[in-house]
Every structure is written in C-alpha cells, then in structure tokens.
Amino acid sequence: PPSLETPCNWQELADEIAGHDAALTIVSRRADAAELFRLIKARADGARCWHLSALMCAQHRSDTIAEIKSALTAHREALAAGQQPVPLHVVSTQLVEAGVDLDFPVVYRALAGLDSIAQAAGRCNREGKLPVPGAVHVFVPPTKAPPGLLTLARDTCKAVWRGLPADPFALPLIDLYFKRLYHDAPSTDKARICD
C-alpha cells in the first residue's frame, strides 16, 4: 500500500478487486469478509463469487473449496484456449492461509502479521503456471484488527515494513519480525518459571 497508516475505503477496494478476472481476498475479521464479499458480488457482474469463514460447517467449507478449485481449473483452461474465462472472486478469513491449496493470479491481504501475509502470498501463482508472476496486494482495512496477538502481529509487521522495503519478505526482515514479535508478545509465564 502507499501507506501502512491510511485505511482503504471498502467500496474503492471492492471496485479494484472486481476488476480482476480472478482474485482471492483475505481479511482478519469475519464481519470484514462478509461486507467485502457483499460489495464485490454487487460489482462483479457475471462473476462467480464465494465467501469462506470458519463459521461454515466443515462439510460446507470443504464442498465450497472443491467448487472453487474446479472453477480455478476451468478459468485456467479457458485462458489457455484463448477464451474469456468466467471471472471468479473469493473473500475469506485467514482460514485459507494454511492447509488450503488454492492458486490465484491475484491475492489481496488485509494488513496482518508478516507470517500471515507470507501465507497469503503462497496462494498466488502457487503452482507456477502463470505466464507472468502473480500479484499480491496488501491493504489497510478501515476496521480495527482483532485484539490480542493479531493486533500485535499487525503492528510488528508495520514497524518492520516502515519505509516500504523493496523486498518485504527478505530474510533479515522476517528475522527481525519474529524477534520483535516474540520480544513484545505478552508472556504466559506469569510465575516466571522460564527465567
């Protein structure tokens, strides 16, 4: 993002995302996922749109992910055949960041911990089949991050990314992120047994 301090506008972000043929958007709050899904679906005329959250029962979530994978395969096949694919958009909470094998050409991630952003980036051109590199966009949502560790991780990422580094996933930055995160994290060792 141009600034790690300036929140986006949901409507403008939805317009931008809806302009892509295929995009995965990941946010940290269920309410954000529902709102952004509603806005994208209203703008993405003719597109297939899905919403994923941990509130879905496991079978429904699995069925939806299988449907998304099938749509992604059809999307890639249409592009390979020189045809116009049916646009598709997924808005999800962070449940897709680990253990869910999705491969999108464009991924949007709400500002979060560096580890979460890296996991989200792993859903972009995951299989390396795109003719050009995929694109990962980080945005600052207009809502507050959930309290606790998620806020601490987001704030630590903001501190490490000050000045918007050329390579946001450079190993020295990742090392610094985890050192700061674990140093600043509230301890569960109330009796100081580990000291």
Question: Language-model segments: which ranges?
Answer:
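Short, well-ordered loop/turn elements at secondary-structure boundaries
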Residues: 18-21, 84-87, 101-103, 132
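Glycine-rich phosphate-binding "P-loop"
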Residues: 1-8
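C-terminal helicase lobe and adjacent C-terminal extensions/tails of nucleic-acid helicase motors
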Residues: 8-22, 26, 31, 35-66, ...
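Short, flexible, glycine/charge-rich loop motifs used to bind or transfer phosphoryl groups or to couple energy/partner
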Residues: 13-15, 79-81, 97-98
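SF2 helicase motor core recognition
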Residues: 89-104, 119-127
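Conserved helicase ATPase core of P-loop NTP-dependent helicases/translocases
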Residues: 57-92
